[in-house]
């Protein structure tokens, strides 16, 4: 190992150490229902035999992730039992919130982020120092990950680490290993399958399309690898005749099109249009039955139909996502370049976020993290990432609704914006050329008028939602701030989708 590589690793560890210190400080922060969800999964996998994992209904927070994540929870439960046996008790552990369970689960997320650290390391180890350091800062210090994983509570950093590892191997031309890791990721969390068509087309064209004999051998090889991964995950449940129950838990379509807090996607406009038309038609004398205001509360069977516009089914959203991804698939087939994989993956997840079924706002991390890798490739990519990462982070604000958390989320976004600005300004400044012409050094990193105006609009939205609404309306129209945030952020995400599509087509 040369001196440069040692220095790079030390700097990466410094980034991770700073992030870890912040995460430790966030341990006492408030927790979402996801905290109890994962505690209950620890109890299920530790207290029950495998054959009962996907049948247990002791709590409403039933196990609905793929088997590899269940195995992961089972592994964690071994240590949880040593820390406090009540953590993994199905009955007495319900809604258990002692310090032991809080610290154990928080620290388990922090430790699992080592997977993210290794993914970033593999992706950036061959880049020039400035680009590498910038990606490390954007990913490891991601405010979205801090909010979702280390306050709200989830394991997105761990899962995204698998995704980054997969992309890193594809970029190195090690397609078989990249495909293997992606298959493993799907068996941890099936929602990452949105980009599976991209992987399929790319691997078929780049890895298998090399002559009849060689191509067929490679196709059989990678097919066998994927089948082996899924057999390891689902084999025990197939053996016990429970695969249908597992699938029904993983795909609870009865939860409805949208989550309780509307994720900033295309369906926000569809819902608003439906409600607006319903009100208008009723005023015009038509008998229109207006359903309840919340399209879903997040539980199975808790969803509302549309009043005027056609009902949307899971099949409809699947078709729309596939149609939106299709230009990327065509590009991947015509030009299967490994350097474009991260861009295609990010675009596919953007499509899934915009047009998918029952999308959570947290899913924006699926495309903002890969886009951080893309951001260092060109000045235009940096400008785009600056906008979309701010919008994505701001759309997560409703997850933290406690008054004491307000300074935290504002500070995280402000610091992230400053880090991005300084990093991109340094990345896209030609010091040598400018020193020859003038003593004044100016960066090429400037965002356009639309981007400036839109970001200023975010400040206005926040002032209205956080201060003006409660001051003037009090408890009236409680849904208005969330609807305003979701609608305004949708504009930014739609802009990002169009920008990415244009970039892929050109």
Curated annotation (Swiss-Prot):
Superkingdom field: Eukaryota
GO MF term list: dolichyl pyrophosphate Glc1Man9GlcNAc2 alpha-1,3-glucosyltransferase activity
InterPro entries xrefs: Glyco_trans_ALG6/ALG8
Membrane topology: Multi-pass membrane protein
TM spans (from-to): 10-30, 101-121, 133-153, 176-196, 219-239, 261-281, 305-325, 339-359, 384-401, 406-426, 454-474, 479-499
This protein's pathway: Protein modification; protein glycosylation
Gene Ontology process terms (BP): dolichol-linked oligosaccharide biosynthetic process; protein N-linked glycosylation
Primary location: endoplasmic reticulum
Biological role stated in the UniProt entry: Dolichyl pyrophosphate Glc1Man9GlcNAc2 alpha-1,3-glucosyltransferase that operates in the biosynthetic pathway of dolichol-linked oligosaccharides, the glycan precursors employed in protein asparagine (N)-glycosylation. The assembly of dolichol-linked oligosaccharides begins on the cytosolic side of the endoplasmic reticulum membrane and finishes in its lumen. The sequential addition of sugars to dolichol pyrophosphate produces dolichol-linked oligosaccharides containing fourteen sugars, including two GlcNAcs, nine mannoses and three glucoses.
Name of the featured protein: Dolichyl pyrophosphate Glc1Man9GlcNAc2 alpha-1,3-glucosyltransferase
